[in-house]
């Protein structure tokens, strides 16, 4: 018994008799409010515990020989698909080789609605050719005229595109397609006239070599000339069909470099740029940071995040001495790699947080209750003393 008596001396929570306890309305209100606060903070702490914690790390990127996937969805409301070409080049200006792509062009009307039910697949570095005749009726070994634009290495023009390229190599303006047999049978003028008031949506993906480079959307047909990438803007063609200015207004619905991961923000998504003048050149300078995202279940996502700076200027589309009109995305790769690792939050931290919430709210509520109780008693005593005198 003496041991138990000594043990009672360490009780930090002495009890009072029920008869000496006073319950008040103020105390009840404080209890209810503090209970609600505890409940809200508890669920907040629980929600925080159930979310995954992401730890960032920084490494030197040692990967070699990888491919870079570029996801594209861009709308050009005032540039017909027949005039628009898409190309990818490396940092040296050479056209990218071994590029896997799945790009489509969707013709749009003035309200940005599809003109046709199906989009046309785009070939990099090539212009689309809508064949309206049966090619079996033509001699496969034929050599048709280039109408004075023949050269030693380009002596036969068996299609309208061949004639146009021969003219470009000579530096001649291609003004009268209706006088050229190849263009007449392929319906070149009808195709251009049909699309002159349309827009174009380009969507799909590119997989290029993981080196600095660019991809761009520009009017005209592209080709390699003396190892230099050339865009023939064909201002004379555009004027002849009513497009006397090149309007490169565009809306970037989506642009990313790789797969999405939780929390990723693509800074160009939803960007809408209006060309205030004709023949504008828009350049997006992109810095790509290789990124690895490791999920809790061990799944590893190898992707990229990027930052971007935009520059625009007016060009002379006819001469091209100030650049060419179009939208150019010039990207370079960071030598550093970011790694994000998902982890579950510690259960002991959760328990510590819950105890802190309960203890803190309980203590503060006790102080508030005591303040209310003793303040009320002091006021009541003053009132009673006033009545007595």
From Swiss-Prot:
Entry's localization field: Endoplasmic reticulum-Golgi intermediate compartment membrane; Golgi apparatus, cis-Golgi network membrane; Endoplasmic reticulum membrane
Keyword Magnesium: no
UniProt GO cellular component terms: COPII-coated ER to Golgi transport vesicle; endoplasmic reticulum; endoplasmic reticulum membrane; endoplasmic reticulum-Golgi intermediate compartment membrane; Golgi membrane
Topological region Cytoplasmic: 1-25, 369-389
Alphabetically ordered keywords of this record: Endoplasmic reticulum, ER-Golgi transport, Golgi apparatus, Membrane, Transmembrane, Transmembrane helix, Transport
Alphabetized Pfam families for the sequence: COPIIcoated_ERV, ERGIC_N
GO biological process: endoplasmic reticulum to Golgi vesicle-mediated transport; retrograde vesicle-mediated transport, Golgi to endoplasmic reticulum
Segments crossing the lipid bilayer: 26-46, 348-368
Lumenal side: 47-347
Topology versus the membrane: Multi-pass membrane protein
Broad class of the protein's primary localization: endoplasmic reticulum
Role, per record: Possible role in transport between endoplasmic reticulum and Golgi.
Family assignment from sequence similarity: Belongs to the ERGIC family.
Protein name per its UniProtKB record: Endoplasmic reticulum-Golgi intermediate compartment protein 3
Organism of origin: Xenopus laevis (African clawed frog)
């Amino acid at each position: 018994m003496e041991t138990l008596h000594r043990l009672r001396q360490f009780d930090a929570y002495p009890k009072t008799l029920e008869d000496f306890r006073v319950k008040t309305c103020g105390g009840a209100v404080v209890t209810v409010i503090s209970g609600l606060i505890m409940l809200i903070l508890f669920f907040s702490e629980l929600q925080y515990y159930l979310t995954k914690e992401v730890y960032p790390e920084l490494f030197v990127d040692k990967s070699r020989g990888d491919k870079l996937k570029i996801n594209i969805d861009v709308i050009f409301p005032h540039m017909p698909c027949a005039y628009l070409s898409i190309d990818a080049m490396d940092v040296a200006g050479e056209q990218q080789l071994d590029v896997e792509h799945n790009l489509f062009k969707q013709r749009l009307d003035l309200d940005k609605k599809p003109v046709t039910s199906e989009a046309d697949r785009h070939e990099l570095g090539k212009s689309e050719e809508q064949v309206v005749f049966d090619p079996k009726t033509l001699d496969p070994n034929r050599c048709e005229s280039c109408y004075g634009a023949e050269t030693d290495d380009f002596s036969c023009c068996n299609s309208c595109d061949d004639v146009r390229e021969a003219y470009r190599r000579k530096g001649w303006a291609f003004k009268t397609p209706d006088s050229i047999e190849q263009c007449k049978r392929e319906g070149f003028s009808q195709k251009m006239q049909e699309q002159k008031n349309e827009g174009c949506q380009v969507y799909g993906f590119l997989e290029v070599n993981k080196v600095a480079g660019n991809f761009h959307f520009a009017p005209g047909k592209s080709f390699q000339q003396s190892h230099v990438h050339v865009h023939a803007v064909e201002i004379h063609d555009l004027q002849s069909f009513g497009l006397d200015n090149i309007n490169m207004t565009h809306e970037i619905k989506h642009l990313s470099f790789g797969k999405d991961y939780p929390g990723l923000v693509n800074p160009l998504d939803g960007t809408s740029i209006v060309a205030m003048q004709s023949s504008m050149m828009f350049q997006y300078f992109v810095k790509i940071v290789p990124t690895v995202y490791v999920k809790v279940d061990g799944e590893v996502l190898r992707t990229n995040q990027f930052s971007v700076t935009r520059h625009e200027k007016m060009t002379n589309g006819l001469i091209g001495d100030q650049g060419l009109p179009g939208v150019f995305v010039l990207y370079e790769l960071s030598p550093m790699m970011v790694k994000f690792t998902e982890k579950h939050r510690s259960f002991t931290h959760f328990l510590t947080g819950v105890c802190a919430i309960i203890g803190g709210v309980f203590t503060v509520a006790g102080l508030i209750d005591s303040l209310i109780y003793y303040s009320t008693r002091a006021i009541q005593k003053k009132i009673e003393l006033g009545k007595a005198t």
